Structures are given as C-alpha cells and as structure tokens.
Amino acid sequence: MTAIHVTSEIKTLKKVLLHRPGNELLNLTPETLERLLFDDIPYLKVAQAEHDAFAKILTDNKIEVVYLEDLAAETLDTDPAIREKFLKQFINEAGINTDKYKNIVYKYLDKIKDNKELILKTMEGINVNELDAKDRNVENSLIDLVSEESKFIADPMPNLYFTRDPFASIGDGVSLNRMYSVTRNRETIYAEYIFNFHPDYKGQVEKYFDRYNAFHIEGGDVLNLNEHVLAIGISQRTCADAIEMIAKNIFNHPNTKIDTILAFNIPNSRAFMHLDTVFTQIDTDKFTIHPGIMGPLEVFEITKGATANDVVVKEMKDELSNVLAKYLGIPSVDLIQCGAGDRVAADREQWNDGSNTVWIAPGVIVVYERNNITNDFLRAKGLKVIE
C-alpha cells in the first residue's frame, strides 16, 4: 500500500490530516486581518471545541486522524541537520532579512528543544518583544527604537487549519502547492519537509507540482472524480498556467492512471475562492453546487498531447450535468443547489460554505450546522447529514 492513495472524493475515508487551531489565532489583530486573509477574529476556545467535535466525528467513524504539527515534529526528530535546515528556511521565508535578526531568531527558536513545541511556535508567530533585549541591543538600534512594540518579526499562520489547501492528494502523489498569497505560501514548508524527510513518506510520494513553481494553485481547487479524471478549478486562487503545468506532469508520469483533467472556470471572486466552496461531490451521482456558478461556468477537457510538452484543451459545450455524467460513466447526475435553489439562502449559506461538505462513508457527509436550509435539502435527497 502506498503512503498516499486518493482516487475519489466519495470512497470510505480512512485517514485525514488536521491542524488543531492554536495560539496563531490569538495573534490576529484588526490591523492584520486583511493581510492574513481573515474577515474576523475567531474565538480560540470555540474554534478548538468545534475542531475537537469534528475530529471526534471522524474517529467515531473509524477514520484515522493525524496532525500536521505531529508529522512536522516527527520529521525534525529524525535528524538534527534537518531541524537546522528547517529553522534557517523558516527564518528566510518569514521575511527576516537582516543578519542580526536572523541570528537572534535562530537562537531564540533553537532554545526550544521539544520539536512539537518548536513547530507550534513557528505556526504561532514571533513578536519582537519575545526576543532577548540584550541580543537586540535595543538602546543602540535605530530599527528597534522606531519599530512598534507589538511588531511581529514572523507573522502567525492562522489559516493552517485549512489543511487541504497547502497540498492536495492526487492518486499516489501530491501537488505541493504554491499558494496565491505570500501569507499562505509559508504554510507549505511543513508539507515540504514531511514529504522529503518523514520516514512514512520520504521517497514514497510522487510530486506533481512544487511550491517553488512560478504559478499558483491551491488544494481547495482539486477534486479527484475517479482514478482517471481529475477536476481543477480556475479560480481566484488557482491559475490556468498552473493547471497546464500539473497536467503535463501527471500525464507524463509513468505510474499515473489519470488521463483527463476537467478545468472548471469559476468566477474570480472572494466568495467563490475555490472550486470546493461552490461544487462538491457527495455521492456517485450527486454534487452540491452554488446556483451562482451554473450559468457562467465553463468546463475545459485537458488530455495528453503529442509530445511531453503539449496538452490538448477542448471546451465542453454541454450542460454541466451531462459533462459530469459522461466522465463518471453514469446515466445522469443530480446537481443539488445550495440553499435549495433560493438565491438569497444560497448566497447566505454559500458564504458559510453551504456547498462544501466532507464525505466520510457511503451516503454519510459532514456539514456546517448553520446552513440549515441546505442541510435539510440534502437529507431530503437521502443522505445522512452529520452537523
């Protein structure tokens, strides 16, 4: 059995990667919300309680839960040289540019001997006031004398609990993503080290895309329809160039079974940031969908070209339901509209991820409790809905 094997959105779920919200949320402020891609400041106690409830649903259904912070810590445990390399790379990617502060932050982090505690600290962010004042030589430093007392020398990573985005599982491999924003691109360092150095994954996972590529793609835009067909959204967070690049890499890999990629061109909007926020497979013949994308949605078929550097792109001029049925090899599909088709309810519940569900077993999905109209509509369609 390979370390990763994902060929469907709707087979029985066996293993899930999570990140439990931590002190990084306490380091959000009104001034940093926009830069750190948040609309509001979550209440950490409630966020952790909701996370724990979700994790319990998974474990109660015999799904193994692994944590990003644990895998990253286990990776650093393997070799002091890997830990040193990680710290230096983290400091560079945090935008710490002066040699003085690179050395001070390295010294500060290297004092944390427990690697899980260290990983959590890198996620949490580092305030300049945490650093040793003697090392900083504050009274003789223009930088320190004019800087804000509460300045973060390394920003927190509050988006980490969206673990699907930094990398996506595709068949027996991964897309290790270059994220849309600088803020989130730092998150992919953990997956880079896990896949390169963790004993459970090192040398066992194909890489179809790398975080150092020039084009941006995020995991929320990647859906495994079956072992032969991959769906990717062209969205605010994933560009067409990245899709062509990943298509070439997948098609030219000797072990892949994927021969078709369907590119869904969704509106470039904050409300529709990823394909999985507006379109999710929830059964062999059922999908949730936000009605706002049904009219303008374009779908393109991408297949292998005559050479390794070519792909063939063809626009699918048909109803979305017919396109999906064709590539899934079934007579028809049911597109279940968020908000039960009511546009006001759809827009409201879509903002709270009403179209975004997690399939955990045949006919069983996990949803957000607050989207009651959509959830009741899903129950009426015969699905077991866990809130």
Report residues per predicted region:
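The feature marks the mature, well-folded catalytic cores of soluble enzymes
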Residues: 1-387
